[in-house]
Amino acid sequence: MESVEDIPGTALHEGIPWGWESFADYLHSIDTPYVMDVGAQVPHVAVRHYVMGARCYDDATADDIAAMAAITKQALQDGALGFTTSRFYGHFDKHGALVPGTHADGEELKAIGNALAEVDHGTVEIISDRMEDPDEQHWVEWIAKRTGRPVTILVTSNIGADVWGMAEKLNAQGLKIRP
């Protein structure tokens, strides 16, 4: 968050109680009265880093993918609002590298999509600079159809027409795609 959302690292370290490991622990740590409704989503970046450690920028193994899907499923069962993934070439980590998961294989995302389908809960939020790529469109369409869950695609300037076209097609099929 400190590099993607421009939140100073010191503010994160001082303002967030870091004594948690699981998503349920995290939700418990922030369970205090708020003046607004707050929903927490499972970020692909964090799950990938947790499962793969320093290898989080590499291709995931079958075991890595299974672990990411299991963690996502458990987080959804524990109260996560949904799952998010960034495939946007403007999201960098604090070292200047693209965030983990930017180049994740569609099969990895489909496995995580299966977790959403099994729970039948949650939303999917995607930001991608590759929506003109048929492979990218394929896994997004697959997740929308497999899960039946709402999918939000954040539109970057170079892919708007591709996203709108896909959304119109899938919405006509009764799916919930929102650019």
Where are these regions (language model features)?
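Histidine/acidic residue-rich metal-binding segments in metalloenzymes
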Residues: 24-30, 59-179
